[in-house]
C-alpha cells in the first residue's frame, strides 16, 4: 500500500502571498468618499469554509487619495488562486478591510469594504498577468458595507 503524503505548506507561504505589493492596486475616481491627501490603509482577511474569518493580514497596503476634489477608490485585488489553494483548500473568499491613517496610525477600526467569493462571480482571469482579479469600489461607507 502506497501512502500519500500531501506536501507540507509552511506558514511562510501565507506571508509570501501577503508581501506581494501588486496584490492590491488602486485607482482614484470622482466621488464623495475621500478628501484629497487622505491615506487609506487596506488589509485582507481570508474566509474559511464560508464561515470562519482569519485575522487581518500583518501586511497592509496604503493608498493616498490624489487630485483636488473628493474621490472614491477602486481597489483591484490580484490573486493567484492556485497559490491560495496551496495554502488551504478551505479558503472560500477574501475580505478587504480599510481604515483611515493619520501620521502612520489607524484612526479607526478597520471597516469591511467587501467580501469577494473565490469563484467566477467574484474574480475574473486577467489573461495578461495570469492572475485572477476583482475590482472593489470603496466610497468610505461605514456601518453599511456591502458583502454582495
Sequence positions of predicted segments:
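Disordered, low-complexity "stalk" and linker segments at domain junctions of extracellular
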Residues: 1-148
Amino acid at each position: 500500500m502506497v501512502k500519500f503524503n500531501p506536501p507540507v505548506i509552511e506558514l511562510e507561504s501565507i506571508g509570501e502571498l501577503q508581501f506581494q505589493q501588486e496584490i492590491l492596486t488602486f485607482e482614484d475616481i470622482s466621488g464623495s468618499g475621500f478628501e484629497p491627501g487622505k491615506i487609506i490603509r487596506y488589509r485582507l482577511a481570508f474566509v474559511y469554509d464560508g464561515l470562519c474569518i482569519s485575522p487581518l493580514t500583518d501586511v497592509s497596503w496604503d493608498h493616498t487619495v490624489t487630485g483636488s476634489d473628493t474621490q472614491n477608490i477602486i481597489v483591484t485585488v490580484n490573486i493567484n488562486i492556485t497559490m491560495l489553494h496551496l495554502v488551504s483548500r478551505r479558503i472560500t473568499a477574501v475580505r478587504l478591510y480599510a481604515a483611515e491613517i493619520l501620521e502612520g496610525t489607524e484612526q479607526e477600526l478597520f471597516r469591511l469594504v467587501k467580501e469577494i467569493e473565490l469563484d467566477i462571480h467574484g474574480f475574473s482571469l486577467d489573461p495578461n498577468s495570469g492572475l485572477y482579479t476583482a475590482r472593489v469600489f470603496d466610497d468610505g461607507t461605514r456601518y453599511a458595507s456591502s458583502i454582495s
